[in-house]
Amino acid sequence: VIQGREVFLKAEDFMQDIVKSIIQKNDSKIVLVVLDGLGGLPMHGKSELETADIPNLDMLARNSACGLHTPVFFGITPGSGPGHLALFGYDAIKWQIGRGALEALGLGIELRKTDIAVRCNYATLEKGVIKDRRAGRIPTEKSRKLTEGLQKKIKKIENAEVIFAPGMEHRFAVVLRFPAPLEKGAADIMDTDPQKEGKPPVKVTPMCPQAEKAAKIIEKLIRAVTEIIKNQAAANFILLRGFSQAPDIPHFEDVYGLKSLAIATYPMYRGLAKLIGMDAPAVTGGVKEEIDFLKQNYKKYDFFFLHIKKVDSYGEDGNFKEKTAEIERFDHILPGILALEPEVLIITGDHSTPSLLKGHSWHPVPVLLSSAYVFGGLCNSFSERECTKGELGIFPTVNIMPLALANALRLKKFGA
């Protein structure tokens, strides 16, 4: 346990137990908008949020409770899975769930106790080193055809059935399905993704004896796939990360008493939502289509998770201009959400992805919470620096859900 985290882990258990005991039902609506990778850092003096022309977000921030949240702990850079779990009130260290399980669930594969899932990227390998970890973000249709071709040629390795599932752009998932339930630790295998260009792929390495069999099969899988795609111009190699088994995690509705809908175009985020029992139908299109889907289903649910991916993608590409523009595009259609008049509207990110760093970072994430029961008036705009002035301060991400429930008047008094 990280020093100082033991108390925090116990506090998360305590929080969920207490919240469960004081839940009360009403007709209020809670909308959580996640601009993936929202937080940034200054380039030429201003961050992406500070540079963006976002009159609607700025107006909302002036009348909202604002602050900054830390998904894992100070100084710890979170992945997307931990970041989202924390937003939903699950401690990211207690519930360590591999990216593979999330990706596979999001792509419609129901995981069994016999399965190991892994998230895969098509990549460009040149002279033994990774030139591009995302194969130039190859188009989704080309990626789909490549993945379907792999499935036709690779159906089984040793005693494991191999299931390929095409994803978005360079992404896909692989599930190894064994004939019998696996013991704990069977998926404890190091990622082969070096996380940076200019480095060789990481050797497949089991981290415990229970993972040795699967690691050998993964080595054979990589060799077989590479032989098939080696003549592709960009997607001539694969990188694997997030080896995982199906986890057993409490359902969102059981904890919070909320019937919930996830609206996300990227499979991993639908997978995460499904994992905790949210309805997560496939949604296609852009942000406008996501908001249209929200409107169409608004009367059917209590809680809505709306995920917007491209903010993070541009941050990872180091594209400050386009990350800023994507935030502006969201601001332009934000009135469509405001028109629904949810009792609680939260807008934030799952982590920071500064264009300056071209990747996720440890920096606290700006958040605004709009409801009838906040002070407001402390921030002049929505940005990292302005949110430091807000009434929420800097706080653990797992506290967002209790705050949402309280502002929706869904929590009774605790104690006499």
Regions found by a protein language model. Give the residues of each.
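Feature captures the catalytic ectodomains and active-site-proximal regions of enzymes
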Residues: 8-416
